């Protein structure tokens, strides 16, 4: 009987959550991410994507592309995590087992769809999306096919806010023209090998013989990719254990001999790991840098922050402070950066622009034995905010509360005045009020209150307090 695997992907999830809870932002080009000089876009609304802005892009570059109308919002991960839990509560109730890939996407294989027609699958997916939209207010896209690969490609075709079903007899119409890099597992190295063979599309790979694939790519990985290219994907949908660490490392054909080469390698690995961290939706408390020297010695050093963060500038700065160079340890062959101590809830940093200054790790003692890790912690290393910053108290996009006007968010602050827009998910576009910076009635608020899901939080034991 026909097997149907579905892939659901929330549309521009972080930005959609901001537009949901702050009606003023609906229809505007929203960029979610760090505001520091090395800030990175964690999420971009479709209005911002029209200008070429995208996730993982340096914030200054995204702002330049969008122009004067760009709205930059500090991430509120506690809101995104709560929204994700509510979305997948709905998905699991309808579909049963769900294989979560990240905070905003997952696979499912509903028993009710075994042997179903493409039309029935489309109707089921539309009903799921409609319930998610009705309950949470958030848009989603669903792809469906005979396996995970095609389902995930299908959800990309469905975006934004749609369903794309790929019948078995039509799957090669979708797969064959796509670049071979669209296949799961085809990275730069494999892609380079395939290119040298004249393989540019998935159809080109599917047309190879089994012997050609085994000789060029190996009997295990090669055949797996070949099967995916031919539309054969029997991987089961099953729950995944939550990742405890996110990392990326690269081995170099030629030894790294200069500081500049090592710096470039750290940036390459840090950026790759950070892209995966953003997709995961959690923040990291611990940063580690791994080096393997030309003589195969391995050195790994780590540093633990006092809070979890996904701010790229902070994480990169920490990695650089952990780095060692050829003048100290000799020629280097491998460089890796990893993030661990992953947490859904992270400390709300009042002064995000000071993040990089907080990281002042002492020089750790290094053990050169293979696999031994030395570490240090930031628990005893604190940098106080300057008095003029500390007195300011308010930062743009911060959640606040006023006893007369209710929940709102800071639109701007300066010269002794703070402007607040009062609105939540369940209101219309809110009005703006200005207050003295030290007005006692204006207080910091729980970001979760902007969702107006008090009943659901009570039923599910959810709170906005960090544990």
Swiss-Prot record:
SUPFAM superfamilies documented for this protein: DNA/RNA polymerases, Lesion bypass DNA polymerase (Y-family), little finger domain
InterPro entries named among the record's database cross-references: DNA/RNA_pol_sf, DNA_pol_Y-fam_lit_finger_sf, DNA_pol_Y-fam_little_finger, DNA_polymerase-Y, DNApol_IV, IMS_HHH_1, Rev_trsase/Diguanyl_cyclase, UmuC
Subcellular location: Cytoplasm
Site residues (Substrate discrimination), renumbered to this chain: 14
Pfam families linked to this entry: IMS (PF00817), IMS_C (PF11799), IMS_HHH_1 (PF21999)
GO cellular component, one term: cytosol
Molecular function via GO: damaged DNA binding; DNA-directed DNA polymerase activity; magnesium ion binding
GO biological process: DNA-templated DNA replication; error-prone translesion synthesis; SOS response
Family designation: Belongs to the DNA polymerase type-Y family.
PANTHER family (UniProt xref): DNA POLYMERASE KAPPA (PTHR11076:SF33), DNA REPAIR POLYMERASE UMUC / TRANSFERASE FAMILY MEMBER (PTHR11076)
Record protein name field: DNA polymerase IV
Organism: Corynebacterium glutamicum (strain R)
Lineage: Bacteria, Bacillati, Actinomycetota, Actinomycetes, Mycobacteriales
């Amino acid at each position: 009987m026909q097997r149907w695997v579905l892939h659901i992907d929330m549309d521009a999830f972080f930005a959609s959550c901001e537009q949901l809870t702050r009606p003023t932002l609906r229809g505007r080009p929203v960029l979610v991410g760090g505001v520091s000089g090395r800030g990175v876009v964690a999420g971009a609304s479709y209005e911002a994507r029209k200008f070429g802005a995208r996730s993982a892009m340096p914030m200054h570059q995204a702002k330049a592309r969008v122009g004067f109308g760009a709205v930059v919002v500090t991430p509120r991960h506690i809101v995104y995590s709560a929204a994700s839990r509510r979305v997948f509560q709905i998905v699991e109730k309808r579909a049963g087992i769900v294989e979560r890939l990240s905070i905003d996407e997952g696979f499912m294989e509903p028993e009710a769809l075994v042997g179903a027609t493409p039309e029935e699958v489309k109707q089921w997916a539309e009903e799921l999306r409609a319930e998610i939209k009705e309950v949470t207010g958030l848009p989603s896209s669903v792809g469906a096919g005979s396996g995970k690969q095609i389902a995930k490609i299908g959800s990309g075709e469905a975006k934004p806010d749609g369903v794309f079903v790929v019948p078995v007899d039509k799957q090669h119409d979708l797969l064959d023209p796509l670049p071979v890099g669209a296949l799961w597992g085809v990275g730069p190295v494999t892609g380079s090998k395939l290119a040298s063979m004249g393989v540019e599309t998935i159809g080109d790979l599917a047309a190879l013989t089994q012997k050609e694939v085994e000789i060029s790519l190996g009997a295990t990985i090669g055949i797996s990719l070949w099967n995916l290219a031919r539309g054969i994907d029997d991987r089961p949908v099953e729950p995944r254990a939550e990742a405890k660490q996110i990392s990326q490392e690269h081995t170099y054909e030629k030894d790294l001999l200069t500081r500049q080469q090592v710096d470039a390698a750290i940036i390459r690995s840090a950026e790759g790991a950070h892209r995966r961290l953003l997709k995961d939706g959690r923040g990291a408390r611990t940063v580690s840098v791994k080096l393997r020297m030309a003589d195969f010695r391995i050195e790994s050093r780590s540093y633990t922050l006092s809070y979890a963060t996904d701010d790229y500038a902070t994480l990169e700065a920490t990695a650089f402070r952990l780095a060692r160079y050829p003048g100290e340890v000799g020629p280097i062959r491998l460089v890796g950066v990893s993030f661990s101590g992953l947490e859904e809830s992270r400390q709300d940093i009042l002064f995000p622009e000071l993040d990089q200054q907080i990281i002042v790790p002492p020089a750790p003692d290094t053990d050169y034995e293979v696999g031994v890790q030395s570490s240090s912690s930031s628990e005893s290393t604190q940098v106080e905010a300057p008095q003029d910053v500390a007195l300011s108290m308010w930062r743009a996009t911060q959640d606040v509360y006023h006893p007369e006007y209710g929940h709102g968010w800071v639109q701007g602050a300066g010269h002794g005045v703070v402007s607040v827009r009062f609105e939540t998910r369940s209101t219309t576009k809110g009005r703006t009020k200005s207050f003295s910076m030290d007005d006692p009635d204006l207080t910091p608020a729980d970001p979760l209150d902007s969702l107006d899901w008090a009943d659901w939080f009570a039923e599910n034991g959810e709170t906005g307090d960090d544990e």
